[in-house]
Amino acid sequence: MDREAFVQTLTACRLCPRLVAWREEVVGRKRAFRGEPYWARPVPGFGDPEARILLFGLAPGAHGSNRTGRPFTGDASGAFLYPLLHEAGLSSKPESLPGDDLRLYGVYLTAAVRCAPPKNKPTPEELRACARWTEVELGLLPEVRVYVALGRIALEALLAHFGLRKSAHPFRHGAHYPLPGGRHLLASYHVSRQNTQTGRLTREMFLEVLMEAKRLAGL
């Protein structure tokens, strides 16, 4: 399956009734975006097709990616992430706006679940259902050498993808686990508002993760 076929098939997915209902139900709920069009479909990844770094998040935000159709775009997570990608030399611009000409260099963004879940909490069944899309999407990125999991659930989804045991690869910010073929798995706190506004994840902490990913990827 090529990239175009993947996007067409993914965005037509309705496997998870709860997620389908929620991604459509939230349209127009937030006053700031009332009247704006919403993507309200599964969100495909975004970035460099020859990426050597993959940033792997949890799921679209109801009024962020679910509205804009681009990962980490339209909410506080993106407002934190993109300036740091730009500072690290991985993005052409310090912000992501729907329909802009933003380019990512050597990095690709996607998530464990591709539809917005209620309370940002996908169920185990929803994670398993979306694992089929992870399999396809990561297969379209053969140059990736460094996988950066944003949060525990994202880490566990990647461990499942690689057939690795959770008990041998616990989540902690800054964790580094070797993968077969000279690849690497890094873990970071998620770039969510909950983490960045409380100081659990600072700009300096995340920039350090990005620079380590660049070093390991040979960028």
UniProtKB/Swiss-Prot annotation:
Q: What is the effect of changing residue 75 to N/Q?
A: Loss of XDG activity, but retains much of its UDG and HDG activities
For this chain, one GO molecular function annotation is: 4 iron, 4 sulfur cluster binding
Tree of life domain: Bacteria
Cited Pfam families: UDG (PF03167)
**Keywords tagged on the record:** 4Fe-4S, DNA damage, DNA repair, Hydrolase, Iron, Iron-sulfur, Metal-binding
Gene Ontology terms describing biological process: base-excision repair; DNA repair
Q: What is the effect of changing residue 58 to D?
A: 4-fold decrease in activity
- What are the EC numbers? 3.2.2.-
Binding sites annotated in the UniProt record for [4Fe-4S] cluster? 13, 16, 115, 130
Matching PANTHER family, A to Z? TYPE-5 URACIL-DNA GLYCOSYLASE (PTHR33693:SF3)
Q: What does this protein do?
A: DNA glycosylase with broad substrate specificity. Can remove uracil from double-stranded DNA containing either a U/G, U/A, U/C or U/T base pair. Can also excise hypoxanthine from double-stranded DNA containing G/I, T/I, and A/I base pairs, xanthine from both double-stranded and single stranded DNA, thymine from G/T mismatched DNA, 5'-hydroxymethyluracil and 5'-fluorouracil.
* Family note: Belongs to the uracil-DNA glycosylase (UDG) superfamily. Type 5 (UDGb) family.
- Name this protein carries in UniProt: Type-5 uracil-DNA glycosylase
What species is given as this protein's source?
Answer: Thermus thermophilus (strain ATCC 27634 / DSM 579 / HB8)
Taxonomic path:
Bacteria, Thermotogati, Deinococcota, Deinococci, Thermales
